């Protein structure tokens, strides 16, 4: 088995909730991450915007709190998702979320 695990913190910029035709609750957030990291002994600004998908009953208790401006830390795995326009994009499927504010 190969490793695919990511922990990322940031601020929610957009969120939406819906239920699938099978009745599964989903929350989709856009997470904005800003930080500074050292690379090759130089400080580098890091900026990422990535979609995070939270699916199933384990996230229903926090779903109402996942609004723009809220800081969170998510842990999950990355995968490609094909958009309606046919373009592939990298997304995170959350396995855990922690509210920071």
Swiss-Prot record:
Q: Does the keyword DNA-binding apply?
A: yes
InterPro entries for this protein:
NA-bd_OB-fold, Primosome_PriB/ssb, Prisomal_replication_PriB
Gene Ontology CC entries for this record:
primosome complex
Report the family membership.
Answer: Belongs to the PriB family.
Q: Please describe what this protein does.
A: Involved in the restart of stalled replication forks, which reloads the replicative helicase on sites other than the origin of replication; the PriA-PriB pathway is the major replication restart pathway. During primosome assembly it facilitates complex formation between PriA and DnaT on DNA; stabilizes PriA on DNA. Stimulates the DNA unwinding activity of PriA helicase.
HAMAP family assigned to the protein according to its UniProt record, in alphabetical order: PriB
Provide the protein name.
Replication restart protein PriB
Q: Which organism is it from?
A: Shewanella baltica (strain OS155 / ATCC BAA-1091)
Lineage of the species this protein comes from: Bacteria, Pseudomonadati, Pseudomonadota, Gammaproteobacteria, Alteromonadales
Tell me the name of the encoding gene.
Answer: priB
């Amino acid at each position: 088995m190969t490793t695919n695990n990511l922990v990322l913190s940031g601020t929610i910029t957009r969120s939406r909730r819906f239920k699938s035709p099978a009745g599964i609750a989903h929350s989709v957030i856009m997470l904005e991450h800003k930080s500074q990291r050292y690379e090759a002994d130089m400080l580098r600004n890091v900026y990422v915007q990535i979609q995070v998908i939270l699916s199933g009953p384990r996230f229903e208790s926090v779903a109402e709190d996942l609004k723009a401006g809220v800081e969170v830390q998510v842990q999950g795995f990355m995968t490609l998702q094909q958009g309606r326009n046919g373009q592939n994009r990298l997304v995170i499927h959350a396995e855990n979320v922690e509210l920071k504010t």
